[in-house]
A protein has these predicted regions:
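Active-site cores that bind ATP or allylic diphosphates and position pyrophosphate for catalysis
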Residues: 124-263, 270-274, 326
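Alpha-helix initiation and N-capping motif
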Residues: 67, 100, 123-126, 138, ...
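Short secondary-structure transition/capping segments
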Residues: 94-109, 133-139, 162-170, 290-305
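Structural motif
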Residues: 28-30, 200, 277-278, 282
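N-terminal Rossmann-like or analogous alpha/beta NTP/dinucleotide-binding catalytic cores
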Residues: 2-130, 134, 225-226, 230-243, ...
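A short, terminal or domain-edge coil/loop segment
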Residues: 75, 105-115, 171-184, 298-317
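Catalytic adenosine-cofactor/nucleotide-binding cores of aminoacyl-tRNA synthetases and other
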Residues: 117, 122, 229-230, 240-326
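A general structural signal for well-ordered secondary-structure junctions
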Residues: 80, 116-117, 135-136, 151, ...
Length: 326
C-alpha cells in the first residue's frame, strides 16, 4: 500500500485541512510550538484550514485547565485555528475524552472482521521476554496471546482484565512523507500487533487519531518525527475502516543543546516561562530560524512566514537548539 504525501503546491483544487492535536498533560514547550507552527504554515501556505483537537484520552493525566491554557498560548502566538477546541464546530466532539461512543463503533467494525483479540501480557512480562523494540522505543509484541483458545481466555479473564490488540499481517506499508521522504515498514516485523484498547477500557492512540482525523476531514497531518513509526499502523487502520487517509509530514525533533528531547515533565522551555521573557513575534522568529525558514532569528509573525514557506527548507535531521537562542 502506498500513500503519497508531498506538499509542494501553493494552490490546490481543494485546500488542505491540517490540525493541531496537542495532549494537555502540561504546558506547551518549544518542541510542541515548533510542530504547531509548521502545521499551521503548511496548511495556510496553500490556502488551507486548521482544526484544533484536544487529545485527552487519559483524562486523569490531562486536566481541562491545561487544554484551556494551550488554547490561550496558541492564540497569543498568532496560530489561529478555524474550528475545534472550545470554539466548537461542525465535526465535534473535539475533546477525545468525549468520544468513547464514536471509537466504540469503529472498534466494533474491526472486531467483526475477526482481527481483534484479548491480551493479558503485562508491560513487565514483555520487557522480560527481550522482544525487539520499535524505532520509538516500544516493544514489538511477539504474539504471545494471539492464539489463545476460548477456554484459555475465559480462565485468564478470571484473574485479569485484558487489553485488546489488532492482528496485523506480514505486509509492507510504503508512503512518501512530506518532510522525511519515502518510508517503508513491515507491519508484522517492525510494528507487531498493537493495542486498540487498554485493560481499563480507554481506547488507544492509534485508533482514536485515525477515527478523529477522518471524521474531522483532516487531509494532512504534520507532527513530530517521533511519530513516524505510527504511520504504517494508522494507514492500515484507515484501510480496514474504509476511511480516506491523509497525507503525512513528520518534522524533525527539537533537542536541547545536550541532546535531550524537550519534555513537558522537565519543564524544558515551557511557554509559561518563555512568555515572561519574549514577545510572541520573538518566539516565532527564533523557531523559524531554528527550522531553516529564515536566515536569522529576527522577530516574525506567523502570517509573515506564509509566502516563503516550503518543506524543502526544513531539515530532515533532529535539530539541536542553539545555545542562547532562548
Amino acid at each position: 500500500m502506498q500513500e503519497q504525501a508531498v506538499f509542494t503546491q501553493k494552490t490546490e483544487p481543494v485546500p488542505p485541512t491540517g490540525r493541531f492535536a496537542p495532549s494537555p498533560s502540561g504546558r506547551l514547550h518549544l518542541g510542541n510550538l515548533a510542530c504547531s507552527l509548521l502545521a499551521w504554515l503548511s496548511a495556510r501556505s496553500r490556502g488551507g484550514r486548521i482544526v484544533l483537537r484536544i487529545e485527552d484520552l487519559d483524562a486523569e493525566r490531562c486536566p481541562r485547565v491545561y487544554a484551556d491554557l494551550l488554547e490561550q498560548d496558541l492564540d497569543w502566538l498568532g496560530l489561529v485555528w478555524d474550528e475545534g477546541g472550545s470554539h466548537g464546530g461542525p465535526h465535534g466532539p473535539y475533546y477525545q475524552s468525549e468520544c468513547a461512543a464514536i471509537y466504540t463503533e469503529s472498534y466494533n467494525k474491526l472486531e467483526a472482521q475477526g482481527l481483534v483479540y484479548p491480551c493479558f501480557c503485562s508491560r513487565a512480562q514483555l520487557h522480560a521476554a527481550s522482544a525487539p523494540h520499535t524505532s520509538d522505543g516500544n516493544v514489538i509484541y511477539p504474539g504471545t496471546c494471539r492464539g489463545l483458545t476460548a477456554e484459555q481466555i475465559a480462565e485468564k479473564s478470571k484473574k485479569k482484565a485484558p487489553a485488546y490488540r489488532l492482528m496485523v499481517p506480514d505486509e509492507d506499508i510504503t508512503f512518501t512523507d512530506g518532510c522525511m521522504g519515502p518510508h517503508t515498514e513491515n507491519l508484522l516485523r517492525d510494528c507487531g500487533d498493537f493495542y486498540l484498547r487498554r485493560a481499563d477500557g480507554v481506547f488507544a492512540y492509534q485508533l482514536a487519531v485515525v477515527v478523529d482525523d477522518a471524521r474531522m476531514g483532516v487531509t494532512e497531518v504534520v507532527r513530530g518525527a517521533d511519530l513516524l513509526s505510527s504511520t504504517a499502523r494508522q494507514l492500515y487502520l484507515y484501510r480496514l475502516l474504509g476511511l480516506p487517509a491523509p497525507k503525512f509530514a513528520h518534522c524533525p525533533l527539537l533537542l536541547a543543546p545536550d541532546g535531550r528531547r524537550l519534555s513537558k515533565r522537565d519543564g524544558d522551555q515551557s511557554l509559561e516561562n518563555l512568555r515572561a521573557k519574549y514577545t510572541a513575534q520573538e518566539i516565532v522568529g527564533r523557531l523559524a530560524f531554528a527550522y531553516g525558514l529564515q536566515p536569522e532569528p529576527a522577530p516574525r509573525t506567523p502570517e509573515s512566514l506564509i509566502p516563503d514557506f516550503s518543506w524543502d527548507k526544513v531539515p530532515k535531521q533532529d535539530i539541536y537548539l542553539p545555545e542562547n537562542l532562548f
